Amino acid sequence: MTVETITPQTPVSLPKTAVICNDFKLDRVNEPARSILEKYSKIPSREILEHVRKIRDEAFAEFPYPCIGRFSFLDLSISQSPKYPEILHRVVNGEKFLDLGCAFGQELRQLVYDGAPSDNLYGSDLHNGLMHLGYDLFRDVSTLKSRFIATNILEGNSDLISQLSGQMNIIYSSLFFHLFDWDQSLVIAKHVLRLLSLQPGSMITGRFVAYRDWNFAKEKLGSTLRFYFDLSSWTQLWKQVEVDTGSKLNIEHWEQSDNMLTDNGIGGYMLCFAITRQ
């Protein structure tokens, strides 16, 4: 196992989306997370729920993100993606995969559980503390060969970019892009593209919370608006990346149901995407 600690050059505070979720109750651990914890991590079935609660409480005390408070890291969204069979096949056959904003590295454990060699997997997050807790959550500190790098992706000279530039065949990012405004997202998108292999078919995929109509959401929510994209602006972002970098990209999108989101009258939904080099 390798976790590289890097101090971000620009201080980054917790996002405004961090709300109080400390009282959220977890009554059971669903599949596929339960099987991974039982069969991969070798945690007795009767101990799984208490084990997960303990790790969540420890993480939430330091990193009070909603996705931690609400145990969303147990959803393992990558397995629900229509791209997952392709991702798994490619990684099993030697391609390199990066989870950007990986938190505990739970999506990496899904891939390993399904047969991917862990030394083809990379994870990155702003907080190395979360990645360290991932070893406690999955009890694999002595067996996992994946490499983790703590970094601020807004920094163009970060170790993540300098060490892995052009090496990643697949980059996955879940519940990440909605934390940033247009200008920040444009910077991040270009930095992520630098990490991606120049080989056609190299792919950036993932999901984030978006609005069906951002202007409508802005009108309804005003200063309490939490997220920054609808489908139109997301597509425009990557069209701008194409212009600025001279890249040719295929942009796909689809919707994914999610337990975190309810119909509150403003049209929030889980926007999934795949950006592929042509």
UniProtKB/Swiss-Prot annotation:
Catalytic reaction(s) noted: chermesin D + S-adenosyl-L-methionine = chermesin D methyl ester + S-adenosyl-L-homocysteine; asnovolin I + S-adenosyl-L-methionine = asnovolin K + S-adenosyl-L-homocysteine
InterPro entries recorded: Meroterpenoid_MTases, SAM-dependent_MTases_sf
Group of enzyme by EC: transferase
Pathway the protein takes part in: Secondary metabolite biosynthesis; terpenoid biosynthesis
Inactivation phenotype: Completely abolishes the production of both novofumigatonin and asnovolin A, but accumulates the tetracyclic intermediate asnovolin I.
GO molecular function, one term: methyltransferase activity
EC code: 2.1.1.-
Residues binding S-adenosyl-L-methionine: D125, L126, N152, I153, L154
Keywords on record: Methyltransferase, S-adenosyl-L-methionine, Transferase
One example of a Gene Ontology biological process annotation: methylation
Subunit structure: Homodimer.
Family: Belongs to the class I-like SAM-binding methyltransferase superfamily.
Protein function: Methyltransferase; part of the gene cluster that mediates the biosynthesis of novofumigatonin, a heavily oxygenated meroterpenoid containing a unique orthoester moiety. The first step of the pathway is the synthesis of 3,5-dimethylorsellinic acid (DMOA) by the polyketide synthase nvfA via condensation of one acetyl-CoA starter unit with 3 malonyl-CoA units and 2 methylations. DMOA is then converted to farnesyl-DMOA by the farnesyltransferase nvfB.
Protein name as catalogued: Asnovolin E/Chermesin D methyltransferase nvfJ
Species whose genome carries this gene: Aspergillus novofumigatus (strain IBT 16806)
The organism's taxonomic lineage, starting at the top: Eukaryota, Fungi, Dikarya, Ascomycota, Pezizomycotina
Gene name for this UniProt entry: nvfJ
